[in-house]
């Protein structure tokens, strides 16, 4: 029997407001434990929450960027549960009237485009953070009360690769709106996945399992890949899928049972009595709409139509707002668009991945990389020499022009000087000339290599090829 996988994702995004959602405490990451708290966050008796208006602005901006309808008459609700990182024994969230609903994003994966629906986006407060040491646990309440939006997809995702593409696109859009930095390593973007399988052709959903401990997009994909196989094995052996919560173990690549899943009724939602209903008038909504910047899809379209990039290259560039903004600044500084894109997608991305860094953590600037690209474009240096210049720029910064000058890296483009070297190489390699004339194309590569060796890699490659062809034809 063949099964179809059905996946829905719940993504929590911390909003980068200066203060928390219901208290004036700072909402910044990295402070000493239990220093960014107030009596409101800790649930002291008699204190009342006050809604941070910036949180509503940010939530609306994110929802609109995800093509959602804004609920202009909304409210908050209490979600009741007890856990050590939740000092009030309830969380202020939104239940039946989320601020955003009925959205969608388009993803590109495995050669096709697919629209994934988004059920809802709602505001809520984050919980504290537990850490475990030996036979006891520690709790840090700095995160308690940090503003969140939870973004819930429709069960439209059918493969782990689609889930990965959805998360990449969602993260990109949120970063472009500037409401969150979406750093998974700091917990400002977290994802839970719901997955079930059903026989192909069956309309009714199977029993779902929720996956947690998904600390990277790759772990989301791996966890889903394992879980769809596990569920298929259970059904094919005559078993029944239980509704449960499982965690992904990155060491084994398997999912492990945590607990039987609670239903919505277990949380005993009811309207938050300490907050009035929230009314969003048309003027407020229109102001937030006007603040939405150019989003990835629009920027990709502009790169293709105005800068002549291929749809693939444009799509790769716009996924990361940091990379895309850097590219834009390079263009402003006069660099060629296609060559700039090649460097950013190639050597720059390879370096960042290898070193696990962001662009801001390097000595590169749009100005110095644009200067290097212009030196390649005007023939001052070759792309090969450019790699040497790049290695210096990314570590130490400075001026590309000065590096080329100080290290004597200017490309040899003087035809007379190159002709002398070409002639000498040909005189010393008669067999290679003969091989080339007999159809062995590799021989020309050997000859080019000898010339590059003689010039320490500084010969102009197109000129070398032209002179070689001319001089071989004469012999």
Curated annotation (Swiss-Prot):
Annotated GO biological process: glutaminyl-tRNAGln biosynthesis via transamidation; translation
SMART domains: GatB_Yqey (SM00845)
Pfam families per record: GatB_N, GatB_Yqey
Enzyme Commission code(s) on record: 6.3.5.-
Domain of life: Bacteria
Protein's job: Allows the formation of correctly charged Asn-tRNA(Asn) or Gln-tRNA(Gln) through the transamidation of misacylated Asp-tRNA(Asn) or Glu-tRNA(Gln) in organisms which lack either or both of asparaginyl-tRNA or glutaminyl-tRNA synthetases. The reaction takes place in the presence of glutamine and ATP through an activated phospho-Asp-tRNA(Asn) or phospho-Glu-tRNA(Gln).
Protein name listed in UniProt: Aspartyl/glutamyl-tRNA(Asn/Gln) amidotransferase subunit B
Organism of origin: Lysinibacillus sphaericus (strain C3-41)
Gene that this sequence comes from: gatB
């Amino acid at each position: 029997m063949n099964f179809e996988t059905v996946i829905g994702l719940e993504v929590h995004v911390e909003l980068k407001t200066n203060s928390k959602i219901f208290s004036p405490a700072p909402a910044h990451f990295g402070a000493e434990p239990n220093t960014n708290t107030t009596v409101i966050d800790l649930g002291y008796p008699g204190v009342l929450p006050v809604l941070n208006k910036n949180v509503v602005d940010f939530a609306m901006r994110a929802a609109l960027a995800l093509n959602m309808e804004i609920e202009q008459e909304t409210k908050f609700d209490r979600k009741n549960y007890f856990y050590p990182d939740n000092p009030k024994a309830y969380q202020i969230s939104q239940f039946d009237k989320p601020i955003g609903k009925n959205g969608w994003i388009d993803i590109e994966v495995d050669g096709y485009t697919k629209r994934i629906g988004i059920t809802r986006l709602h505001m809520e407060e984050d919980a504290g953070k537990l850490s475990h040491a030996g036979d006891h646990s520690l709790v840090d309440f700095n995160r308690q009360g940090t503003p969140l939006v939870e973004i819930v997809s429709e069960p439209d995702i059918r493969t782990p690769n689609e889930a990965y593409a959805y998360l990449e696109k969602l993260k990109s859009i949120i970063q472009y709106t500037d409401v969150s930095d979406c750093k998974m390593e700091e917990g400002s973007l977290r994802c839970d996945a719901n997955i079930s399988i059903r026989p192909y052709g069956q309309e009714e959903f199977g029993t779902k399992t929720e996956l947690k401990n998904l600390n990277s997009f790759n772990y989301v994909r791996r966890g889903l890949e394992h879980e769809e196989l596990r569920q298929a094995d259970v059904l094919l052996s005559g078993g029944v899928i239980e509704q449960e919560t499982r965690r992904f173990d990155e060491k084994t690549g398997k999912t492990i049972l945590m607990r039987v899943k609670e239903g919505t009724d277990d949380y005993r939602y009811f309207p938050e009595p300490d907050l009035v209903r929230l009314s969003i008038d048309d003027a407020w909504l229109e102001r937030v709409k006007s603040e939405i910047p150019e989003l990835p899809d629009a920027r990709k379209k502009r790169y293709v139509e105005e800068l002549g990039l291929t749809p693939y290259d444009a799509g790769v560039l716009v996924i990361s707002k940091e990379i895309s903004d850097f590219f834009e600044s390079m263009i402003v500084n006069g660099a060629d668009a296609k060559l700039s894109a090649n460097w950013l997608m190639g050597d720059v991305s390879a370096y960042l991945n290898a070193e696990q860094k962001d662009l801001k953590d390097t000595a590169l600037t749009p100005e110095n990389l644009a200067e290097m690209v212009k030196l390649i474009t005007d023939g001052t240096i070759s792309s090969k020499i450019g790699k040497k210049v790049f290695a210096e720029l990314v570590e130490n910064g400075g001026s590309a022009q000065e590096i080329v000058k100080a290290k004597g890296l200017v490309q040899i483009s003087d035809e007379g000087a190159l002709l002398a070297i070409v002639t000498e190489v040909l005189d010393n390699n008669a067999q290679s000339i003969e091989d080339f004339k007999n159809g062995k194309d590799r021989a020309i590569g050997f000859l080019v290599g000898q010339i590059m060796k003689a010039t320490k890699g500084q010969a102009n490659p197109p000129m070398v090829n032209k002179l070689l062809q001319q001089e071989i034809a004469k012999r």
